[in-house]
Each structure stands twice: as C-alpha cells, then as structure tokens.
A protein has these predicted regions:
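Class I S-adenosyl-L-methionine
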Residues: 1-239
C-alpha cells in the first residue's frame, strides 16, 4: 500500500465517519459533516511531528480558512495540503499553500505529469487561452512498483515539502472513481470503501474518553521513534 512503512492516523466524528469533514466537500455525499475547523485539533496537527521526522496531511476545507495558521516556510511543522476540486483551483491555491488534486487517468502526459492553468483569458470565440501554468506531478506510488510514501523523496515525501513549486496529482481510483474524477458530481470519496472504510468505521464507533483528539494526536506523535514519517488522517479532516 501507499502508506507502507509510515505511521498513519484516522479521524471521525462520534458515530459519524464524516463528522470531521467539511459539508462543502464534493466527495462527501453523506449530508453530514462540519462547517468549521476545530482550532485545538488544527493546532495539535501542526505540532504533531516526530522528532527529526516529518508529517503531512490533506484537507478539503477551503485553504483561506487555515492558511494563516500554517506557515509554508516553516520547518518542523506538519505540511497541510489543500485538496483542490479542479486543476484551476489547485493552481490558484498553490501560490499560497501546498496543493493536491484528483484527476482522471486520461489526464496524465506520459503517465507521470500534466499542468494546471494559472493565468489566461478568453478569445473572441470564448476559448480559454492559457498564458501560465503550474506543473502537476503524479504521485510516484501510482506507477512505481513496490513504492510507498516511506520510499518517496528519500525520507522527505513530496507531499511533506511545503515549499514545493508544483502540485501533486492523484489518479481517481476505486469503485467510485468516475465520481471522484468529476468535480461536478457528489461522492467518490476513496475512504468510503474497502479496508480504509473498515478502519474509519472503527474510529467512529470507538468509545470517546476525556482525552481530546488534539491531546491524543500530540501523544501519538511524541511516542514515535526518531525520524518517523506520519500521514495524518488517512480518512477524516480538521473539522
């Protein structure tokens, strides 16, 4: 799997797998979720980096809601990637925060890269003419055999590089890949099926104690060995 060899976390609402996800996420067709970010959890997320290690995650919450709290130029902080709905929105966001996007398999050039329009305009026929673009690099684990996040970047995964000048692209996959690849269609969350869904369900059904998600996360990161890599909330979000 992509996450072989690294530490991962899951997050869910109480008895509600989508409870921490934004209601605005196009992949969330549950009708449930959160309309705001949990500030205590988000602060803990930024701090939850193993000693001499790196952490990264993704969020579907609009980047302008959290960008001022996540320093793109800071080291020793969890890298929060904005999961964009389209190539155009990914390109715009990438000027401020690290960005990723889900694409159909047909989008890739030679199977490894494409570009996202950053600037341009329309001609007198209404056609969009691109004048600038941002490079989109496909996740290497999608085309390299026996390759995982633990192998990526020699201990510095691409998604954990806050100062990168390119977007990371993922290919829509699974039973709902058509929905995932279409920003106009609701649904398609990869975590809503398979083994990820089993772990996500277990997280939502687990008994809640007095320890907050923020405290649990800090404790988890602190307990990992030096040099570890964490992918935070494989499923779930910062709400």
């Amino acid at each position: 799997t992509k996450t072989r060899g690294i530490a991962v976390t899951y997050r869910a609402g109480e008895r509600d797998i989508y409870g921490t996800c934004p209601t605005s996420c196009e992949m969330n067709c549950s009708g449930k979720g959160s309309q705001k970010i949990d500030p205590d959890y988000f602060a803990a997320l930024l701090d939850a980096v193993p000693r001499r290690g790196v952490s990264f995650t993704y969020t579907h919450f609009a980047w302008h809601l959290w960008a001022d709290r996540s320093d793109k130029d800071s080291t020793g902080q969890t890298v929060v990637n904005f999961s964009a709905k389209t190539l155009l929105s990914a390109a715009a966001a990438s000027r401020v925060v690290p960005a990723v996007v889900v694409l159909p398999a047909t989008e890739w050039i030679k199977g490894k890269y494409t570009s996202a329009p950053l600037l341009g305009g329309t001609n007198n026929r209404g056609d969009f003419i691109q004048t600038d673009a941002v490079r989109v690099v496909r996740c290497p684990a999608e085309y390299k055999e026996n390759f995982s996040c633990g192998d990526c970047g020699s201990g510095s995964p691409l998604c954990a590089r806050a100062d990168r000048d390119y977007i990371i692209g993922f290919t829509a996959h699974g039973a709902s890949k058509r929905k995932a690849a279409d920003p106009e269609t609701s649904g398609g969350c990869y975590a809503d099926g398979g083994h990820v869904r089993l772990h996500w369900d277990a997280t939502a059904k687990s008994d809640q104690d007095d320890e907050t998600d923020a405290d649990k996360l800090r404790r988890f990161a602190k307990g990992l060995k030096s040099g570890s890599i964490i992918r935070h909330h494989v499923a779930g979000d910062i709400g």
